[in-house]
Amino acid sequence: MATFGMANERLRALEEIEREIAAILLNAGNAILELSKEKPNERMLDKQAAQFTASVQRVESELSGQIRYLTQVATGQPHEGSSYSARKDGTMALNRIDYSRVKLAELSRTCEQMLEQP
């Protein structure tokens, strides 16, 4: 259940990034609108530019965090909420057990054949 919580949290973070990108576009549009006026209001331009810059920095920071997380997941490194590594180790152990059983059965047959020979 914790895995779903983390996944939902990641999705909420991506939705917030999407809203922030919409704010960036809105700020850029407002700045362009202000620049298109005959006498642009410098204070308004500064405010729009500051909001634009702050939003871009937040998006960059959040996306970097998301990319770091995805890099960890994609490379198979252990990360919170993942059981991939443990499942892989368990599967490999079961495969080794099966292989050992096959080899022991072959060895047993060989021993029996050797004992049956006069």
Curated annotation (Swiss-Prot):
- Function as written in the Swiss-Prot or TrEMBL entry: Component of the Mediator complex, a coactivator involved in the regulated transcription of nearly all RNA polymerase II-dependent genes. Mediator functions as a bridge to convey information from gene-specific regulatory proteins to the basal RNA polymerase II transcription machinery. Mediator is recruited to promoters by direct interactions with regulatory proteins and serves as a scaffold for the assembly of a functional pre-initiation complex with RNA polymerase II and the general transcription factors.
Gene3D superfamilies assigned: 1.10.287.3490
Q: Name one GO cellular component term.
A: mediator complex
Q: What is this protein called?
A: Mediator of RNA polymerase II transcription subunit 11
Q: Name one GO biological process term.
A: regulation of transcription by RNA polymerase II
- Where is this gene product found? Nucleus
Subunit description: Component of the Mediator complex.
Tell whether Nucleus is among the UniProt keywords. Answer: yes
> Where is this chain primarily localised?
nucleus
Q: Which family does it belong to?
A: Belongs to the Mediator complex subunit 11 family.
**Highest taxon listed in the record's lineage:** Eukaryota
Which keywords are on file for this protein? Answer: Activator, Nucleus, Transcription, Transcription regulation
Q: Which organism is it from?
A: Xenopus laevis (African clawed frog)
Q: Identify the PANTHER family for this entry.
A: MEDIATOR OF RNA POLYMERASE II TRANSCRIPTION SUBUNIT 11
- GO MF assignments: transcription coregulator activity
